[in-house]
């Protein structure tokens, strides 16, 4: 009412009530029984980070993308014997056919010591036929390259005696009629192949 004086509202009791409620709330939420205290804190999410702009360069392969390989990454030694060399298959495919069977030659060597570093190396091949006794021959190489001319007749050889071979000498073998292995040695003389020895083994 106008003109009637009334005392102001007491604020102290309200502040006291509010303070008591806050204190009761805080006491009820002590660290010992709080669900907040028992809940692990959230870790920062990757989704809040800003994505990187797309790159035009391909990303490097992951280290865990492929299982480790048991194969070594070292390059193949060109001076090692390599009977699976593509050079052998190419040369054999270009040879004239076997004169007896008129068949091409099988590119898989029966024996040999072919390598790109030897002054003289050879492979023994057979005619690509199902005959019981196919024709065999040796094919010779100088520093990994086929020697097409100037080579003595190499038909009939069936193997190679690597224990008698050197960097410039090849020891080819063939079986004689009486069951003995014979060895014929050929050597690179600087300009061609020459026959240097003939021995009969047991």
Swiss-Prot record:
Q: Could you say which residues form the signal peptide?
A: 1-28
List lipidated residues, N-palmitoyl cysteine: 29
Ranges annotated as biased composition (Polar residues): 32-46
Q: Where is the composition biased (Low complexity)?
A: 62-75
Q: What is this protein called?
A: Putative lipoprotein LprE
Q: Where is this region: Disordered?
A: 29-78
Q: Which GO terms describe its cellular component?
A: extracellular region; plasma membrane
- Residue positions of S-diacylglycerol cysteine lipidation? 29
Organism the protein comes from: Mycobacterium tuberculosis (strain ATCC 25618 / H37Rv)
Where in or outside the cell it occurs: the entry states: Cell membrane
Q: Where is the composition biased (Pro residues)?
A: 51-61
Write down the membrane topology. Answer: Lipid-anchor
The cross-references to Pfam families, in alphabetical order and at most eight, read: Lipoprotein_21
Q: Which of UniProt's keywords are assigned here?
A: Cell membrane, Lipoprotein, Membrane, Palmitate, Signal
Top-rank taxon of the source lineage equals Bacteria
């Amino acid at each position: 009412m106008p003109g009637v004086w009334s005392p102001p509202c007491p604020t102290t009791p309200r502040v006291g009530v509010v303070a008591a409620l806050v204190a009761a709330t805080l006491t009820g939420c002590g660290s010992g029984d709080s669900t907040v205290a028992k809940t692990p804190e959230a870790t920062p999410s990757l989704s809040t980070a800003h994505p990187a702009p797309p790159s035009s360069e391909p990303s490097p392969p992951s280290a865990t993308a492929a299982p480790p390989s048991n194969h070594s990454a070292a390059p193949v030694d060109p001076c090692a014997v390599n009977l699976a060399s593509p050079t052998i298959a190419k040369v054999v495919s270009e040879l004239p056919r076997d004169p007896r069977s008129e068949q091409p030659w099988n590119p898989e060597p029966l024996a040999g010591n072919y390598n790109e570093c030897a002054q003289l190396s050879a492979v023994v091949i057979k005619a690509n036929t199902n005959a019981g006794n196919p024709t065999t021959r040796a094919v010779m190489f100088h520093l990994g390259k086929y020697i097409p001319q100037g080579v003595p007749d190499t038909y009939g050889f069936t193997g190679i005696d690597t224990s008698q071979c050197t960097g410039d000498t090849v020891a080819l073998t063939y079986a004689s009629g009486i069951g003995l292995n014979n060895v014929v040695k050929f050597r690179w003389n600087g300009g061609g192949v020459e026959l240097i020895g003939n021995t009969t083994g047991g």
